[in-house]
Regions:
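General beta-strand structural signal in soluble alpha/beta enzymes
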Residues: 68-72
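Glycine-rich phosphate-binding loop of actin/hexokinase-like ATP-binding domains
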Residues: 88-147
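ATP-binding/phosphotransfer module of carbohydrate and carboxylate kinases, centering on a glycine-rich
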Residues: 1-27, 34-40, 58-66, 80-90, ...
Length: 273
């Protein structure tokens, strides 16, 4: 893996007519539990398992003579939204990313929550919302991700009563795009599954509010192409069911899309320079 990364990076530098002297450092967003202090990948949950245990910071210094920071990709996205997106100007924020999986990360008093073992505030998608629910890839039961994520959706549709009579049955591997489209066309099964997914996300959001006391929830990910349906429902549920005597938690859509984690590289690298 590392030789391939080096080849790609050097190729990018060459195409942009740059040199290593033009870089302050390297920032990497990775879908895993990360020890950002040492630059080690701690746990990957079946994704890129060969990265586990790699000393990327030491490799970067040896290969490029550049400092490297690696961080959980959802945390990187929150840093980006805080630096120049929907969370700019807020110090206490939770961000949910809804897509293939569910990310849930937290910033408290302007700093990412990491914790003693580097996994605080980055496993929001693995809060249990139904203890008798579906098995999750993490080993738990009824996690929000197991109940309403992209990887879980085909199984949810398959097990849904009457799904064979739904237009969803024509898709070999149904995704949220197809689900929301068919719900908009009036398919009753698609509508029921869509509404249940939104309810799961809303319940997860309330759990994150109670855990981290944010003033703002930012919601991003590919599913937010349907923000006009998702955002009002989650906001209504959060404001109705969150125990926040100080006032109401704001709920906003992410603004930066796939560029959020890229922009998050700026404040992440600023932590070491």
């Amino acid at each position: 893996m590392l030789p391939a990364i080096e080849k790609v990076f050097r190729g990018l530098i060459k195409r942009q007519s740059l040199s290593l002297n033009d870089f302050a450092g390297i920032a990497v967003g990775f879908a895993a539990i990360i020890d950002s202090r040492t630059g080690r990948v701690l746990s990957t949950n079946g994704k890129y398992d060969d990265a586990k245990g790699m000393e990327l910071a030491a490799w970067s210094r040896e290969t490029f003579d550049l400092g490297l920071r690696i961080e959980n990709d959802a945390r990187m996205a929150l840093l980006g939204e805080s630096y120049g997106g929907a969370a700019r100007g807020f110090s206490d924020v939770v961000m949910m990313t809804l897509g293939t999986g569910i990310g849930g990360v937290a910033m408290i008093e302007g700093k990412l929550l990491r914790g003693k073992h580097s996994q605080a505030g980055c496993l929001g998608g693995h809060l249990p919302v139904l203890f008798t629910g579906r098995p999750c890839t993490c080993g738990a039961i009824g996690c929000a991700e197991a109940e309403a994520s992209g990887w879980a959706l085909p199984g949810i549709v398959k097990d849904w009563p009457g799904a064979s009579n739904s237009t969803l049955s024509k898709y070999a591997n149904v995704g949220f795009k197809e689900l929301f489209e068919q719900a908009a066309y009036g398919d009753a099964i698609a509508t029921a599954i869509r509404d249940r997914c939104i309810a799961v996300w809303a319940a997860d959001a309330v759990g994150l509010v109670h855990a981290y006391d944010p003033e703002l929830i930012v919601i991003g990910g590919g599913v937010m192409e349907s923000a006009d349906v998702i955002l009002p429902a989650i906001e209504s549920h959060v404001q109705k069911h969150s125990w926040t005597p100080w006032g109401k938690v704001r709920v906003r859509a992410a603004e930066l899309g796939n560029n959020a984690a890229l922009l998050g590289a700026v404040p992440l690298l600023a932590e070491i320079f």
